């Protein structure tokens, strides 16, 4: 059982049911679409594609039980732990290549004093928590590209409400075989974030400000991905499209690691006992970071409540309180632009799990959201939302 709540736990939404997590290492993981109109593919293919042909998001076909194994190795370094977690999902990359990708992403990139019980994720090169994933993504994509013998250049299309943009640009800058294009809303990011992006150096980077908000940028990127004829034309010209947003499973999986690392750190410091549940508060915009914690829970990590924190654009907290996801509201520009979002892409992955992985129901709900702006979802048969 996992509970999602808003603010100071004034509401708790319980997601019940048997986890589909019988895998315990060894076999290579396959990935399926949340909308069910595409067959299972390998992790390397899912990383390269970013988004499924049917418009759905890739999810693992099952969740590996790793906590019982990893709790015996609580003294692992972050790099060692990252390998133990990520290999369960991206096993087809191969041990040597995966370890190399992890080492290139994290070795010497982060420095933080351990003084409190916050996961301080802003100590990477761009001061964004997304460095933890976006330093890894280019490395794992390079390995996936080689594994699938892809000769075309890969164009990374990314929409940002602030920190993803700089982190993606930094991660992919001057990486051979890749180009990165970042769309951001003019007047919708902080002055520092805009300056970080437009001054990014690199022979393969492009930054474009749009008239509109983040949701406009994100929906535009999704439309490009959904244009089959356009993508085919690009392929004929030697280019493939992919994404660095958290819709890409290659972005999401490495974020699971720091929840395991944080939990083991609390045990090692004797602040909790092994097996004690912890509650995790996550400021939430596109629902990727909190979803990574949820995935950690499904892998056995002792998590009690996941607390969804929001700003004035509280579409997610309204959803958790009422069950209605109503995006038909005006976007408010706040001092936390990375959370100025009305359409949270990763919620689709939660809806998929909460509806017992019923792809048809998930597609119906997402179509309803896109067409009408409102949807009502049943979460694992527990209650109507």
Q: For the regions a protein language model found, what residue spans apply to each?
A:
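PLP-dependent amino-acid enzyme catalytic core
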Residues: 6, 14, 19-385
């Amino acid at each position: 059982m996992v509970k999602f709540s808003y603010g100071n736990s004034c509401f708790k939404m319980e997601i019940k049911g048997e986890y589909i997590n019988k895998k315990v290492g060894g076999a290579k993981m396959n990935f399926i679409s949340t909308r069910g109109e595409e067959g299972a593919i390998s992790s390397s293919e899912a990383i390269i594609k970013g988004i499924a042909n049917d418009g759905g998001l890739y999810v693992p076909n099952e969740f590996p039980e790793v906590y019982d194994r990893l709790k015996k190795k609580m003294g692992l370094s972050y790099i060692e732990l990252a390998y133990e977690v990520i290999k369960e999902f991206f096993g087809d990359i191969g041990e040597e290549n995966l370890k190399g990708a992890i080492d290139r992403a994290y070795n010497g990139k982060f420095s933080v004093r351990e003084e409190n019980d916050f996961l301080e994720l802003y100590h990477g090169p761009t001061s964004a928590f997304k460095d933890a994933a976006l330093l890894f993504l280019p490395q794992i994509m390079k390995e996936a590209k080689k594994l699938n013998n892809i000769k075309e250049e890969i164009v990374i299309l990314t929409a940002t409400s602030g920190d993803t943009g700089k982190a993606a640009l930094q991660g992919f800058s001057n990486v051979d075989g890749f180009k990165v294009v970042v769309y951001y809303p003019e007047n919708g990011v902080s002055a520092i974030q805009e300056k970080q992006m437009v001054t990014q150096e690199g022979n393969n980077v492009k930054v474009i400000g749009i008239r509109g908000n983040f949701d406009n940028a994100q929906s535009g990127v999704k439309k490009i991905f959904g244009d089959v004829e356009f993508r085919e034309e690009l392929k004929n010209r030697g280019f493939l499209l992919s994404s660095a947003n958290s819709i890409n499973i290659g972005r999401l999986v490495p974020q699971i690691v720091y929840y395991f690392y944080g939990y083991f750190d609390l045990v090692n410091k004797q602040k909790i006992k092994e097996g004690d549940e912890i509650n995790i508060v996550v400021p939430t915009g596109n629902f990727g970071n909190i979803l990574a914690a949820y995935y950690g829970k499904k892998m056995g990590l002792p998590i009690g409540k996941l607390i969804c924190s929001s700003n004035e654009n509280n579409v997610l907290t309204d959803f958790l309180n009422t069950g209605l996801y109503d995006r038909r509201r005006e976007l408010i520009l706040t001092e936390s632009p990375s959370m100025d979002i009305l359409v949270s892409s990763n919620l689709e992955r939660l809806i998929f799990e909460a509806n017992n992985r019923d792809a048809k129901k998930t597609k119906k709900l997402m179509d309803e959201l896109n067409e009408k702006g409102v949807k009502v979802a049943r979460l694992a048969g527990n209650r109507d939302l």
